[in-house]
Regions:
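Membrane-interface helix-loop junctions in multi-pass transport and translocation proteins
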Residues: 16-18, 22-23, 134, 138, ...
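Helix-loop junctions and terminal segments of transmembrane helices
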Residues: 42-58, 133, 194-195, 252, ...
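Transmembrane alpha-helical segments of multi-pass transport proteins
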Residues: 112, 339, 374-377, 426-483, ...
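Interfacial/gating helices of multi-pass transporter permease domains
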Residues: 14-36, 67, 167-172, 207-216, ...
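Signature of the first transmembrane helix
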Residues: 1-54, 79-87, 117, 152, ...
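Membrane-interface junctions at transmembrane-helix termini in multi-pass inner-membrane proteins
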Residues: 119-146, 189, 342-376, 383, ...
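Interhelical loop/hinge segments that connect adjacent transmembrane helices in multipass membrane
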Residues: 168-171, 185-230, 281-284, 288, ...
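Transmembrane helical elements of multi-pass membrane transporters/channels
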Residues: 1-8, 147, 174-193, 205-276, ...
């Protein structure tokens, strides 16, 4: 997590300074377009681990062999599909996005490089699925972190020290590291897994393919929703307004994506926990888990929102100061887009807890359909506002925030209250009101800090945010946490004997 966040803070300003606003925009566009290609695995990647865990626990190695061989067969078919689509995109990508003469050929060859790299990588994804199935999450996360670290070091060396401006070199680095890490995962499972991992065509059965698809299609809908939500909007911005604006629109999304990872890390276990409680018919525990999880997530998302609104503009000027392409108007637009997006983010992210819990109690199809519908609504609204009004990028940002509003206000809280038998008034009082009190105190502190400290430099901005964090943490402790939660917190930090009151 730390390496990923560090990478997210270091790489964008470095590449923006090296490649320029247009060059970085081309890189982002290629990334968003090729992000759709993994859809061709039809959700298989997300289901392999579950089946491996199931049949390995039963020591049913015949079924395990069928699942692995059938999954590999599907991955190989997907690779062929990726190659075909890449060959179609290759001559048309630069024309479609009206790339300038400087980036016309580069854009085409970059699409070819990334697309063929994905085709090679598809079958290698089986390694990650098997690692999940044999519960070697530690190794999987270690290898992923290693890949992120290697990518960071190479980009710093090539674009920071050697001042390269080549998008092709950047594509080679990104593709090679991804393939290398997946090769290492496959190498490990082929040598260390408790069963033999190999592809046998005779083990590819239609029944196994159907079994895999039965679990993977709901995950596929969720993937489609996420792609339409982020990549679809960024691609539309590049097509309708221009390549240079992609950078302005994508950077706030990137920052909020890293912010959502913090809550995702905390709530990652809610799905299996809900499944376990549902199996034992522990209704009170399900209520408590949902309310507590939403409250913690809202505490985090509200802090991110208030800090982003208060300090977004000076942060962007300090963070991206090395880029000579960004004007004062660009920095103002970055800050305004972030403000629009973060409002939706603050109210929507807490309900990720409900989506995980509902998925854990066999409501994954409901979650998938709602997520896809919300993404379609937000996408269409953003396009409409961008084309039919003078809002431009702000219109698309409103569409982005609308997705969170639909899921986080109109649908999932109501569904959670109904399914977990929680009174809406009690839900608001327990999950949302305490963080709002802490947030109100934070706003007052920010107002006072801005009266005293200038936030135009890192030396003054960092202490301001640190002070806000300390005050907010104290407010959360006294106004948001129950006595039981306080005791649990002290136990976590190693002071179990201290009275939390």
């Amino acid at each position: 997590m730390v390496i990923l966040l560090a990478s997210g803070l270091i790489i964008p300003p470095l590449l923006l300074a090296s490649l320029g606003k247009e060059g970085y925009g081309v890189w982002l566009l290629v990334g968003q377009v090729t992000a759709y290609l993994p859809i061709l695995d039809l959700g298989v990647s997300s289901s392999v681990g579950r089946f491996v865990a199931k049949y390995n626990a039963k020591e049913d190695y015949e079924s395990l062999s069928r699942i692995i061989s059938s999954s590999l067969f599907l991955f190989l078919m997907s690779s062929i599909g990726v190659i075909i689509i890449t060959l179609i995109l290759w001559p048309n990508f630069s024309k479609f996005f009206h790339l300038s003469r400087e980036y016309f050929n580069t854009g085409r060859w970059l699409i070819m490089l990334i697309g063929l790299g994905l085709a090679v990588d598809f079958p290698l994804r089986i390694g990650q699925g098997i690692l999940q199935g044999i519960h070697r999450f530690d190794l999987m996360y270690l290898l992923r972190a290693t890949g992120t670290f290697l990518r960071l070091i190479l980009i710093i060396a090539v674009f920071g020290w050697f001042r390269s401006r080549s998008l092709i070199v950047l594509g080679i680095i990104a593709t090679a590291i991804t393939i290398l890490i997946d090769v290492l995962m496959c190498s490990y499972v082929s040598r260390k897994s408790p069963f033999i991992v190999k592809f046998e065509y005779k083990s590819v059965k239609f029944s196994s393919l159907r079994e895999i698809w039965s679990l993977s299609l709901s995950a596929l809908l969720g993937t489609l929703a996420a792609l339409l939500f982020n990549q679809g909007q960024i691609i539309s911005v590049g097509k309708i307004i221009g390549t240079e604006t992609v950078t302005i629109y994508a950077i706030p999304i990137m920052l909020l994506t890293y912010g959502s990872m913090v809550t995702a890390y905390i709530t990652g276990a809610f799905k299996p926990m809900a499944s376990h409680m549902q199996a034992l018919n522990e209704k009170k525990k399900l209520q408590k888990l949902n309310i507590g999880g939403v409250k913690i997530s809202f505490i985090i998302s509200l802090f991110i929102a208030v800090i982003a609104i208060a300090f977004g503009h000076p942060f962007f000027k300090i963070w991206l100061h090395a880029s000579k392409d960004l004007s004062s108007a660009d920095f103002a637009m970055l800050s305004n887009i972030l403000t629009i997006m973060v409002v939706g983010f603050a109210v929507g992210v807490p309900q990720n807890v409900s989506t995980k819990m509902l998925s854990g109690i066999d409501k994954q199809w409901f979650v998938a359909f709602v997520s896809l519908a919300a993404s379609i609504v937000g996408f269409c609204l953003g396009i409409l506002l961008m084309l039919k009004t003078n809002l431009g990028l702000y219109g698309m940002a409103v569409g982005w925030a609308t997705v969170f509003f639909v899921k986080g206000v109109l649908v999932f809280p109501i569904k959670a209250c109904h399914h977990f038998n929680i009174s809406p008034l009690h839900y608001i009082k327990q999950a949302y009101l305490p963080p709002l009190i802490a947030g109100g105190i934070l706003i007052v502190i920010i107002f006072l800090i801005k009266k005293v400290l200038d936030s135009s430099s890192f030396i003054s901005l960092f202490p301001s945010i640190l002070l806000c964090m300390i005050v907010y943490a104290i407010s959360v402790y006294f106004f948001c946490l129950s006595q039981e939660e306080k005791m649990r917190l002290w136990n976590i930090v190693g002071f179990s004997k201290i009275n939390a009151s």
